[in-house]
């Protein structure tokens, strides 16, 4: 018979990888091709998720306040996963976990206020992984008895804009400014930035084009 023994997969990858891989295959109502090559991708994701909690060779989670971008990433994931669970769209839930993990890795995030809710969030998908991390976090009891996280909409509201600052149409750097900042204040903030002075050099500013919420372009010559 052309079958795959799940015991062999569990022995090689662990039960959580098999569980998440089956969820990741696609919508529940559709037939899905079985391809063991996909198991290594899920295993790689779980290792990356684990590494969020481990830095410099050991467990390392900070109680310091998290960066607003990390909180936005976490609460975007929480919102998406909760919506997907309601629709039984477990495959897109796992995609959301992967996206969040990649973003938090880039941000070098190890803050408890970000990571602890994600442990609770991932517990139905990877229960063994979640229990291990829950214990390492010093939390009492089982993660399955904790309250499932819900998103905080305030973290998802865009309050700033990362403007591309261009000189003669070529983007030279990014400048994050409040979304409600007016045109004159934007112009001042750009001109006060040391990078602007460096790119202008000995040239003169002929014109500055500012479209609030969109672009900044400085014409020099």
Q: What name fits each language-model region?
A:
Residues 180-200:
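A short, contiguous, amphipathic alpha-helix enriched in charged residues
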């Amino acid at each position: 018979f052309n079958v795959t023994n799940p015991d062999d997969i569990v022995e090689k990858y662990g039960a959580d990888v098999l569980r998440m891989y089956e969820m990741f295959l696609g919508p529940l109502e559709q037939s899905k091709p079985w391809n063991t090559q996909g198991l290594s991708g899920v295993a790689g994701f779980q290792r990356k998720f684990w590494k969020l909690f481990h830095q410099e060779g050991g467990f390392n989670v900070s109680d310091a306040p998290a960066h607003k971008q990390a909180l936005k990433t976490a609460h975007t994931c929480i919102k998406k996963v909760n919506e997907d669970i309601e629709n039984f769209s477990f495959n897109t839930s796992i995609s959301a976990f992967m996206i969040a993990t990649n973003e938090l890795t880039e941000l070098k995030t190890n803050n408890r206020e970000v990571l602890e809710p994600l442990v609770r969030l991932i517990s139905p998908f990877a229960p063994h992984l979640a229990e291990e991390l829950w214990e390492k976090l010093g939390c009492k009891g089982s993660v399955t008895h904790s309250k499932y996280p819900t998103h905080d909409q305030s973290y998802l509201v865009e309050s700033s804009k990362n403007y591309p600052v261009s000189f003669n149409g070529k983007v030279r750097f990014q400048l994050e400014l409040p979304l409600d900042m007016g045109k004159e204040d934007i112009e001042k903030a750009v001109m006060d930035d040391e990078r602007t002075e460096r790119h202008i050099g000995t040239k003169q500013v002929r014109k500055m084009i500012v479209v609030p919420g969109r672009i900044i372009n400085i014409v020099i010559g």
